[in-house]
Amino acid sequence: MNSYLLNRALGTVSLSAFHSAQTTRLVHNLEPAPGIRFSSTKSSSSESDEGFAHKAGANVLAIDQYEGRFMVSGGADASVHLWDLESRAAELNYTHEPVSSINKFSHDAAHTHAITSVSIYPFDPTPSTVITTSHDGTLKLSALQPEAITPVHTFNLDCTPYTHSLSSHPSSPLLVAVGTSEKQVRLLDLRSGLSTHGLPGHSSAVLSVSWAPHQPHILASGSTDNRVILFDIRRAGHNSAIATLDMDDAVGLVSPRSAPASYRSRAAFSSHARAHNGAVTGVRWTSDGSYLVTAGQDARIRVWQAATGANTLVHFGPRIQNTSSSHLAERAPLIIPQGYMGAGQETLLWANFNDLDERGEIFVLELREGTFIKRLRVPGLMARRPPTQGRSNALSAARINSLAWRGNGASGEGVEVFSAHGDGTVKTWASRESEEAPTEAEEIEQADRKRKRDVLEEVYRGFMSV
């Protein structure tokens, strides 16, 4: 980093290159910040008090994309909280309290079952509307106010919604895509307050949906039928499904002019194409729309070229876990937005999921090459009692249900990541200088040195007592 500072002073490095180098360093220096807590009750004077954002479990998180100041969390207790992240400034010991909240006891129109997804309306500079789905079979639009969160409209879906997505493209048609326990992707019109139509194509529940950032009419979806389908919402009926991703296709759709005469490109849409050998739990686009990243219950994360649909064959290693569970939910990688990493160094964060062996791990991985960058561990888990063999860890701090990215954390001095956990806590991961946060290897070396000093001191005392 010192060389970049010198070159910046000399004017030999561009501002964008310096910015990428700095933000890359900050991402690589992400570490747990256990002193930053989120508590939905009045903060305790005891620093050892963990503090719980939700009583039954924190399920989902969303941060406003304009200033990154406000975060919304949804819990298994059907509550929704709004948090002001700027109230902390740059302190590393702070307990956040919700600015406003709603639960089934505070409002008659509130959700009655666990929250499954949450997002903040993307077109307001100051967040004013939040969108939530729940196991009660509804999608709700709620107004964010200083003292309360007030539902203003409810879409009754008559099925279980697992996820939803609203495009932030300037030409967005203001349609909310909802993945449900039904086979079709549901489209809800925010302007009319009605359900417009469904997108057929899947043969089972849809767990993840994501609008293309560069095309407001293109939607990607992942399902328990192991398929990823691309839809064009301008088309009707079965014609809306325009392409499927095939994990066995590393070439993709090739133009006849550039392909050999003997080569026959596969059909864009095929009912036999499979993206994973297990349910697809997550679908995400990169910021520029050039790549599509999917996660499946075959313990694989796959990266696809959006232009051709080719599987890039990036392998992230055997450390990835995403096991089958009786509890269906969206589990998608968190892709760091464009501009924070250098060209060709796109990075993603993945929270491992294993019903019977939760370890509280988040992996930082390079998207194009699959290179392992670092592992983040939830602090304090090793000191706790190990889970009972054969029992689910759904209510454990080791269960990471959701990740949220904040690029201007600590009053613009660093980057932050927030994680929602099964025990109801929301934890913070903040970038620190290398001298503030020793690496795992340094910690092991320090522990080894201490052990040797203790042995030598014991031997010395033995000689002195003779």
Which ranges hold each PLM region?
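Intrinsically disordered, low-complexity acidic Ser/Thr-rich regulatory segments
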Residues: 256-280, 285, 386-398, 408
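Solenoidal tandem-repeat scaffolds enriched in leucines and small polar residues
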Residues: 155, 159-268
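Beta-propeller fold detector
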Residues: 92-106, 151-155, 197-199, 240-261, ...
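Flexible loop/N-cap segments at domain edges
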Residues: 287-291
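WD40 beta-propeller repeat fold
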Residues: 1-191, 198-200, 208, 274, ...
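Intrinsic disorder/low-complexity signal
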Residues: 1-15, 435-466
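Beta-propeller blade-edge and WD-like acidic-aromatic loop motif
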Residues: 190, 233, 303-317
